[in-house]
Amino acid sequence: MQRILSSWFVQGMVKATSDMWLKGWDERNGGNVSLRLDAADVEPYRDEFYPAPRCVELSQPRTELAGCWFLVTGSGKFFRNVQLDPADTLVLLQITDDGMAYHIHWGLSNGGLPTSELASHFQSHAVRKAVSGGKDRVIMHCHATNLIALSFVLELDEARFTRLLWEGSTECLVVFPDGIGIVPWMVPGTDGIGSATSEQMKTHTLVLWPHHGIFGTGPTLDEAFGLIDTAEKSAEILVKVLSMGGMKQTITREELIALGERFGVTPHAGAIAL
Protein backbone atom coordinates (compact mmCIF):
# COMPACT_ATOMS: atom_id res chain seq x y z
CA MET A 1 0.00 0.00 0.00
CA GLN A 2 1.23 3.50 -0.80
CA ARG A 3 2.39 5.40 2.28
CA ILE A 4 0.67 8.56 1.07
CA LEU A 5 -2.68 6.90 1.71
CA SER A 6 -2.00 7.11 5.46
CA SER A 7 -0.82 10.73 5.33
CA TRP A 8 -2.70 13.24 7.48
CA PHE A 9 -4.00 15.10 4.42
CA VAL A 10 -5.35 12.08 2.54
CA GLN A 11 -6.91 10.67 5.70
CA GLY A 12 -8.34 14.09 6.52
CA MET A 13 -9.92 14.35 3.09
CA VAL A 14 -11.34 10.84 3.40
CA LYS A 15 -13.00 11.78 6.69
CA ALA A 16 -14.30 15.14 5.43
CA THR A 17 -15.85 13.73 2.25
CA SER A 18 -17.35 10.79 4.15
CA ASP A 19 -18.89 13.11 6.73
CA MET A 20 -20.26 15.38 4.00
CA TRP A 21 -21.85 12.44 2.20
CA LEU A 22 -23.37 11.11 5.42
CA LYS A 23 -24.89 14.54 6.03
CA GLY A 24 -26.68 14.26 2.69
CA TRP A 25 -24.86 17.27 1.26
CA ASP A 26 -23.08 15.50 -1.60
CA GLU A 27 -25.29 13.26 -3.67
CA ARG A 28 -23.78 11.41 -6.61
CA ASN A 29 -20.71 13.45 -7.68
CA GLY A 30 -21.97 16.66 -6.07
CA GLY A 31 -19.60 18.81 -4.06
CA ASN A 32 -15.87 19.43 -4.12
CA VAL A 33 -13.09 20.15 -1.64
CA SER A 34 -9.56 21.49 -1.97
CA LEU A 35 -6.82 21.71 0.65
CA ARG A 36 -3.71 23.86 0.20
CA LEU A 37 -0.56 22.10 1.40
CA ASP A 38 3.06 23.05 2.07
CA ALA A 39 5.97 21.45 0.24
CA ALA A 40 7.03 19.91 3.56
CA ASP A 41 3.69 18.07 3.75
CA VAL A 42 4.21 16.24 0.47
CA GLU A 43 7.99 15.85 0.51
CA PRO A 44 8.02 12.46 2.34
CA TYR A 45 5.92 10.91 -0.46
CA ARG A 46 7.78 12.10 -3.56
CA ASP A 47 8.92 8.57 -4.36
CA GLU A 48 5.24 7.66 -4.91
CA PHE A 49 4.56 10.48 -7.38
CA TYR A 50 4.04 9.88 -11.09
CA PRO A 51 7.41 9.89 -12.88
CA ALA A 52 5.94 11.96 -15.74
CA PRO A 53 3.18 14.14 -14.24
CA ARG A 54 0.44 15.37 -16.53
CA CYS A 55 0.42 19.13 -17.15
CA VAL A 56 -2.94 20.88 -17.49
CA GLU A 57 -3.29 24.53 -18.47
CA LEU A 58 -5.39 26.75 -16.19
CA SER A 59 -8.31 28.73 -17.64
CA GLN A 60 -6.95 31.80 -15.83
CA PRO A 61 -3.39 32.45 -14.60
CA ARG A 62 -3.05 32.11 -10.82
CA THR A 63 0.28 33.73 -10.10
CA GLU A 64 -0.78 34.31 -6.47
CA LEU A 65 -0.73 30.53 -6.01
CA ALA A 66 2.41 29.79 -8.04
CA GLY A 67 4.20 26.74 -6.68
CA CYS A 68 1.40 25.86 -4.24
CA TRP A 69 0.37 22.26 -3.63
CA PHE A 70 -3.27 21.16 -3.36
CA LEU A 71 -5.17 17.99 -2.57
CA VAL A 72 -8.44 18.15 -4.49
CA THR A 73 -11.46 15.93 -5.11
CA GLY A 74 -11.78 14.62 -8.65
CA SER A 75 -14.33 15.58 -11.29
CA GLY A 76 -17.19 13.11 -11.54
CA LYS A 77 -16.08 11.25 -8.42
CA PHE A 78 -18.65 10.21 -5.80
CA PHE A 79 -17.89 11.32 -2.24
CA ARG A 80 -19.29 8.04 -0.92
CA ASN A 81 -16.46 6.27 -2.77
CA VAL A 82 -13.53 8.39 -1.57
CA GLN A 83 -13.07 6.19 1.50
CA LEU A 84 -13.04 3.10 -0.73
CA ASP A 85 -10.44 4.33 -3.23
CA PRO A 86 -8.73 7.62 -2.36
CA ALA A 87 -6.12 7.09 -5.08
CA ASP A 88 -8.82 7.19 -7.76
CA THR A 89 -11.09 9.90 -6.32
CA LEU A 90 -8.50 12.43 -5.10
CA VAL A 91 -5.67 14.25 -6.84
CA LEU A 92 -2.48 15.87 -5.57
CA LEU A 93 -1.38 18.70 -7.84
CA GLN A 94 1.07 21.59 -7.90
CA ILE A 95 0.61 24.89 -9.69
CA THR A 96 3.56 25.73 -11.91
CA ASP A 97 6.01 28.46 -10.96
CA ASP A 98 4.54 30.80 -13.57
CA GLY A 99 0.96 30.16 -12.36
CA MET A 100 -0.24 29.17 -15.84
CA ALA A 101 -0.84 25.44 -15.35
CA TYR A 102 -0.68 22.60 -12.84
CA HIS A 103 0.96 19.18 -12.69
CA ILE A 104 -0.85 16.06 -11.46
CA HIS A 105 1.61 14.22 -9.22
CA TRP A 106 -0.62 11.61 -7.57
CA GLY A 107 -4.19 10.33 -7.64
CA LEU A 108 -6.88 9.91 -10.32
CA SER A 109 -5.46 6.45 -10.83
CA ASN A 110 -8.12 5.60 -13.40
CA GLY A 111 -7.79 8.89 -15.23
CA GLY A 112 -9.76 12.10 -15.12
CA LEU A 113 -9.29 15.64 -13.89
CA PRO A 114 -9.76 17.62 -10.68
CA THR A 115 -13.20 19.02 -9.87
CA SER A 116 -14.91 21.06 -12.57
CA GLU A 117 -15.08 23.88 -10.01
CA LEU A 118 -11.28 24.09 -9.83
CA ALA A 119 -11.28 27.65 -11.20
CA SER A 120 -13.68 28.75 -8.45
CA HIS A 121 -11.55 27.03 -5.83
CA PHE A 122 -8.32 28.64 -6.98
CA GLN A 123 -9.91 32.09 -7.23
CA SER A 124 -11.21 31.77 -3.67
CA HIS A 125 -7.94 30.28 -2.41
CA ALA A 126 -6.05 33.26 -3.80
CA VAL A 127 -8.37 35.68 -1.99
CA ARG A 128 -8.49 33.82 1.32
CA LYS A 129 -4.73 33.28 1.34
CA ALA A 130 -4.32 37.04 1.07
CA VAL A 131 -6.99 38.22 3.51
CA SER A 132 -6.15 35.60 6.17
CA GLY A 133 -2.38 35.98 5.89
CA GLY A 134 -2.08 32.41 4.67
CA LYS A 135 -4.15 30.94 7.50
CA ASP A 136 -7.11 29.73 5.44
CA ARG A 137 -6.22 26.58 3.50
CA VAL A 138 -9.53 24.91 2.67
CA ILE A 139 -12.28 25.66 0.18
CA MET A 140 -15.33 23.41 0.60
CA HIS A 141 -18.42 23.31 -1.62
CA CYS A 142 -21.49 21.19 -1.01
CA HIS A 143 -25.24 21.02 -1.57
CA ALA A 144 -26.41 21.72 1.97
CA THR A 145 -30.12 20.89 1.81
CA ASN A 146 -31.71 23.48 4.07
CA LEU A 147 -29.55 26.39 2.96
CA ILE A 148 -30.62 25.61 -0.61
CA ALA A 149 -34.27 25.41 0.49
CA LEU A 150 -34.08 28.83 2.14
CA SER A 151 -32.68 30.34 -1.06
CA PHE A 152 -36.10 29.74 -2.64
CA VAL A 153 -38.17 31.48 0.05
CA LEU A 154 -35.99 34.17 1.63
CA GLU A 155 -34.99 37.45 0.04
CA LEU A 156 -31.49 37.00 -1.39
CA ASP A 157 -30.07 39.88 0.62
CA GLU A 158 -26.91 39.06 2.56
CA ALA A 159 -27.82 41.20 5.59
CA ARG A 160 -31.32 39.74 5.93
CA PHE A 161 -30.21 36.17 5.23
CA THR A 162 -27.37 36.50 7.74
CA ARG A 163 -29.62 37.97 10.42
CA LEU A 164 -32.10 35.11 10.15
CA LEU A 165 -29.32 32.52 10.38
CA TRP A 166 -27.94 34.27 13.47
CA GLU A 167 -31.40 34.21 15.04
CA GLY A 168 -31.87 30.56 14.13
CA SER A 169 -29.11 29.37 16.47
CA THR A 170 -27.21 31.26 19.16
CA GLU A 171 -23.77 30.00 18.09
CA CYS A 172 -24.06 31.32 14.53
CA LEU A 173 -23.04 34.92 15.22
CA VAL A 174 -19.96 33.63 17.04
CA VAL A 175 -19.01 31.15 14.30
CA PHE A 176 -19.60 33.43 11.30
CA PRO A 177 -19.81 37.04 12.53
CA ASP A 178 -18.95 38.28 9.03
CA GLY A 179 -22.22 36.80 7.79
CA ILE A 180 -22.97 34.96 4.59
CA GLY A 181 -22.23 36.36 1.14
CA ILE A 182 -24.62 35.69 -1.74
CA VAL A 183 -24.02 35.57 -5.49
CA PRO A 184 -26.75 35.47 -8.16
CA TRP A 185 -27.65 32.13 -9.69
CA MET A 186 -24.95 31.41 -12.25
CA VAL A 187 -23.89 28.49 -14.41
CA PRO A 188 -21.51 26.33 -12.33
CA GLY A 189 -18.05 25.33 -13.43
CA THR A 190 -17.31 28.71 -15.03
CA ASP A 191 -14.79 31.45 -14.38
CA GLY A 192 -17.71 33.84 -13.92
CA ILE A 193 -19.16 32.12 -10.86
CA GLY A 194 -15.63 31.74 -9.53
CA SER A 195 -15.00 35.47 -9.83
CA ALA A 196 -18.30 36.36 -8.15
CA THR A 197 -17.61 33.91 -5.32
CA SER A 198 -14.05 35.09 -4.73
CA GLU A 199 -15.28 38.69 -4.57
CA GLN A 200 -17.60 37.68 -1.72
CA MET A 201 -14.77 35.71 -0.11
CA LYS A 202 -12.95 38.99 0.48
CA THR A 203 -15.35 39.73 3.34
CA HIS A 204 -17.12 36.43 4.08
CA THR A 205 -16.14 32.87 4.99
CA LEU A 206 -19.46 31.54 3.68
CA VAL A 207 -20.92 32.22 0.23
CA LEU A 208 -24.35 31.00 -0.85
CA TRP A 209 -24.96 29.83 -4.40
CA PRO A 210 -28.78 30.16 -4.55
CA HIS A 211 -30.68 27.02 -5.59
CA HIS A 212 -27.34 25.18 -5.74
CA GLY A 213 -25.21 25.07 -2.60
CA ILE A 214 -22.70 26.75 -0.33
CA PHE A 215 -18.99 27.60 -0.38
CA GLY A 216 -17.08 27.69 2.90
CA THR A 217 -13.48 28.28 3.90
CA GLY A 218 -11.24 27.81 6.91
CA PRO A 219 -7.75 26.94 8.10
CA THR A 220 -8.50 23.21 8.36
CA LEU A 221 -10.92 20.66 6.95
CA ASP A 222 -12.60 20.42 10.35
CA GLU A 223 -13.03 24.20 10.58
CA ALA A 224 -14.53 24.50 7.09
CA PHE A 225 -16.85 21.54 7.70
CA GLY A 226 -17.89 22.91 11.09
CA LEU A 227 -18.62 26.32 9.59
CA ILE A 228 -20.98 24.89 6.98
CA ASP A 229 -22.49 22.47 9.49
CA THR A 230 -23.32 25.34 11.85
CA ALA A 231 -25.00 27.42 9.14
CA GLU A 232 -26.88 24.38 7.81
CA LYS A 233 -28.14 23.50 11.32
CA SER A 234 -29.56 27.00 11.69
CA ALA A 235 -31.09 26.75 8.21
CA GLU A 236 -32.77 23.49 9.22
CA ILE A 237 -34.23 25.17 12.29
CA LEU A 238 -35.48 28.07 10.17
CA VAL A 239 -37.10 25.72 7.66
CA LYS A 240 -38.99 24.08 10.54
CA VAL A 241 -39.93 27.41 12.12
CA LEU A 242 -41.23 28.78 8.82
CA SER A 243 -43.24 25.60 8.25
CA MET A 244 -44.85 26.05 11.69
CA GLY A 245 -46.06 29.55 10.94
CA GLY A 246 -42.99 31.67 11.65
CA MET A 247 -41.29 33.14 14.72
CA LYS A 248 -43.24 34.35 17.75
CA GLN A 249 -40.03 35.32 19.56
CA THR A 250 -36.36 35.42 18.62
CA ILE A 251 -32.91 36.66 19.64
CA THR A 252 -33.12 40.45 19.68
CA ARG A 253 -30.69 42.96 18.22
CA GLU A 254 -29.55 43.95 21.72
CA GLU A 255 -28.96 40.30 22.61
CA LEU A 256 -26.95 39.72 19.43
CA ILE A 257 -24.78 42.75 20.24
CA ALA A 258 -24.21 41.40 23.76
CA LEU A 259 -23.32 38.00 22.30
CA GLY A 260 -20.71 39.55 20.03
CA GLU A 261 -19.22 41.52 22.91
CA ARG A 262 -19.03 38.41 25.10
CA PHE A 263 -17.12 36.43 22.48
CA GLY A 264 -15.04 39.27 21.09
CA VAL A 265 -16.40 39.27 17.54
CA THR A 266 -17.63 42.14 15.38
CA PRO A 267 -20.99 41.32 13.77
CA HIS A 268 -21.75 42.10 10.13
CA ALA A 269 -22.85 45.75 10.25
CA GLY A 270 -25.75 45.42 7.85
CA ALA A 271 -27.18 42.36 9.57
CA ILE A 272 -26.93 43.75 13.10
CA ALA A 273 -28.59 47.01 12.01
CA LEU A 274 -31.81 45.31 10.88
From Swiss-Prot:
InterPro entries linked to this entry: Aldolase_class_II_sugar_metab, Aldolase_II/adducin_N, Aldolase_II/adducin_N_sf, Rhamnulose-1-P_Aldolase
Stated name of the protein: Rhamnulose-1-phosphate aldolase
Reaction catalyzed: L-rhamnulose 1-phosphate = (S)-lactaldehyde + dihydroxyacetone phosphate
Annotated Zn(2+) binding sites: H141, H143, H212
Record-listed E.C. numbers: 4.1.2.19
Subunit annotation: Homotetramer.
Coiled-coil regions listed in the entry: none
Predominant localisation class: cytoplasm
Manner of cofactor binding, per the entry note: Binds 1 zinc ion per subunit.
Top EC class of this enzyme: lyase
Annotated compartments: Cytoplasm
GO molecular function: metal ion binding; rhamnulose-1-phosphate aldolase activity
Cofactor: Zn(2+)
Pathway(s) where this gene product acts: Carbohydrate degradation; L-rhamnose degradation; glycerone phosphate from L-rhamnose: step 3/3
Pfam families named in the record: Aldolase_II (PF00596)
Keywords: Cytoplasm, Lyase, Metal-binding, Rhamnose metabolism, Zinc
Any one Gene Ontology cellular component term annotated for this protein: cytosol
